[in-house]
Amino acid sequence: MAKLTKRQKALEGKVDSLKLYAIDDAFKIVRDCATAKFDESIDVSVQLGIDAKKSDQVVRGAVVLPNGTGKTKRVAVFAQGAKAEEAKAAGADVVGMEDLAEQVKAGNLNFDVVIASPDTMRIVGTLGQILGPRGLMPNPKVGTVTPDVATAVKNAKAGQVQFRVDKAGIIHTTLGRRSFDGDKLKGNLQALIEALNKAKPATSKGIYLRKVAVSSTMGVGVRVDVASINAAAQG
């Protein structure tokens, strides 16, 4: 096990790993401990009360964070005709068909999100081995295979994040940047929690939102009291 640096020890000394912090306090600690010389990403992990081995309990979806992510995303769209024009008007960075597929095959993947009109899947389907491992393969479950490509582009540009439970039943995603104030981070977390609640499998039993922890790129993890998230949303 790697030794902790003096900086890491000092940061961990500011957090009680056994304590559940109220949402406002949790974000204050995380932001105070994000002392790197760059605008650290603020991330969240949510452990769900599901069995990820069961196909009917795989939680997957997307949500537009109301305060964005702090990152400008490049969006590629597979579309033709009027759909292609709509995608361009909505702000897509790259729009194409076979020509875009050739770019992908050549390894030119200078984009963060790929969106596809349903009628283009005959082309996009051949790119699964390239796009899939990079998390770029369009999927209707997260709104990236859709006839409404314009809205999908706008959502991606507005700060939409995709989420999918891992084998341990945990969701990992970003909430923003160190430069965001606590209220913006809180609003984004509440939007994510609302989306996760809507995506709850009917077969999930017991407590659904089991653990929530927030952290920064180079900082510490802080556990959040789920009740405080719900209370803040209702208040």
Swiss-Prot record:
It comes from Methylibium petroleiphilum (strain ATCC BAA-1232 / LMG 22953 / PM1). This is Large ribosomal subunit protein uL1. SUPFAM superfamilies: Ribosomal protein L1. CDD domains: Ribosomal_L1. Keywords: Repressor, Ribonucleoprotein, Ribosomal protein, RNA-binding, rRNA-binding, Translation regulation, tRNA-binding. Binds directly to 23S rRNA. The L1 stalk is quite mobile in the ribosome, and is involved in E site tRNA release. Protein L1 is also a translational repressor protein, it controls the translation of the L11 operon by binding to its mRNA. InterPro entries: Ribosom_uL1_bac-type, Ribosomal_uL1, Ribosomal_uL1-like, Ribosomal_uL1/biogenesis, Ribosomal_uL1_3-a/b-sand, Ribosomal_uL1_CS. GO terms for molecular function: rRNA binding; structural constituent of ribosome; tRNA binding. Pfam families: Ribosomal_L1. The gene is rplA.
